[in-house]
Amino acid sequence: MGVLLYERDTNLTIQGINSIENFGLIGIFILEPAEPVPPLSKEDLQFEQFQTIYMFKIKENLDRLQANQPPASLLELVKDIQSHYGVLDHKLNFAQNLRSSADFVYKHSISVAILSALIANQMRIPDQEKAALITASLLYDFGYLYVPQSVLDKGDDLTDSDRDFIQMNLERGYETLRPQYETFQLPKPSLEIIQQAVFRNSKTLKIKEPVENIKLLADILIAADKFDHLTAMNINKAPISEVAAMAEMKKQRGAYNPLVLAALAPVSYT
């Protein structure tokens, strides 16, 4: 799932070793005293810690949903992300962890949820709608869990049939969530946002235009999704800079809401 990075001269403890198993990590890195490292602020360190904890929590919740069980701590995770990143009034140093095909769904979902919270705060979205957006951001890629590893391992080298297959499974993920949404006491607007995000590329179903506030929330999710795909570190694909990502998205006229891109800019780069 990734690595756990400790500061210089950290003593390795039994608890640290157990973290490898508990969090599904590849390993633990401890920097040597002479190892050059850029200064990390308290916020940077906190962000790294939160990413690891959040990833563990979203994996647990998505695994439960896949087994048709109610999520254990999803709403708690939403509240935590909202309390930390839905109120942030400055740029976040968005340090990315390396992703593989085995863990990208979890890491991508967490990054998109945080980005969505940052954008929503810039746009002064009400708290209730912000929570619905964060929930949708954590769940909209649920269908990727049905995609075989052999397809995910291709990265961007997908055939048209691969893309159609992935789209089919994203729609399957939505249809799996839909009948149990109220039972699981998840925000109803979240399901509408997920529907807009999932079915916008569907060849089988044309969805109706949503009400204005749902459309805006879906636009935020779609922009955050693309921005993270472009800037994330993947084993199969090198990332591009945040500035280059913004430039590429602005060039695709009509694909992304200009108001959303204007709100993304101050929280994504200086």
Residue positions per predicted region:
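Acidic/His-rich, divalent-metal-binding segments that scaffold phosphate/diphosphate chemistry
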Residues: 33-167, 178-179, 184, 189
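Phosphate/pyrophosphate-binding active-site loops
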Residues: 161-162, 172-176, 232, 245
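Terminal helices and disordered tails flanking the catalytic cores of nucleotide-processing hydrolases
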Residues: 1-81, 88, 237-270
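DG-centered beta-turn motif at the end of beta-strands
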Residues: 140, 225-226
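Histidine/acidic-rich helix-loop-helix segments that form or flank divalent-metal centers
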Residues: 10, 137, 178-222, 236-240, ...
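Conserved phosphate/pyrophosphate-binding and hydrolysis machinery centered on Walker-type P-loop NTPases
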Residues: 6, 99-109, 132, 210-213, ...
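An amphipathic alpha-helix signature
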Residues: 113, 167, 171-174, 191, ...
